[in-house]
Regions:
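Long, amphipathic, Lys/Arg-enriched alpha-helical "connector/arm" segment
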Residues: 106-114
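N-terminal core-binding DNA-recognition domain of tyrosine recombinases/integrases
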Residues: 5-21, 27-106
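N-terminal positioning helix adjacent to the helix-turn-helix/winged-helix DNA-binding module
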Residues: 1-4, 114
């Protein structure tokens, strides 16, 4: 794990007060993004919005559910918010990326005859 990712993990646990499981999920996602970017000669700190969108498309093609995609996007938002707060970046490449709408089922209605 890189020093930057370790700092982000500490931020999630102490400042953002995320649970260990949530922090672990976010860290795994950021490490996967880091590996993806490395293939293109980029780092987490010089990734563009286009890079993030390409990564998300690649991840969604593996058949992930909307809730998983929402968690992935939330991890990107948290990471780049951390980078802004720490003055590691001057911009947030994830700011225009929206979380997918969640499927909402109507509640079951109780039948008075049953």
């Amino acid at each position: 794990m890189s020093i930057l990712v370790r700092r982000f993990q500490a931020y999630l646990l102490s400042t953002r007060r995320r649970s260990v499981l949530t922090a672990d999920a976010y860290i795994r996602e950021i490490e996967m993004l880091e590996s993806f970017l490395f293939q293109y000669g980029k780092t987490l700190l010089d990734a563009s919005e286009e890079d993030l969108l390409t990564y998300l498309i690649r991840r969604s093609q593996s058949g992930l559910q909307r809730t998983t995609m929402a968690r992935i996007i939330a991890s990107l938002h948290s990471f780049y918010r951390f980078c802004l707060n720490e003055k590691l970046r001057a911009d947030d490449p994830s700011i225009q990326i929206r979380t997918p709408k969640q499927d909402r089922n109507l509640p079951d209605v109780l039948d008075p005859d049953s």
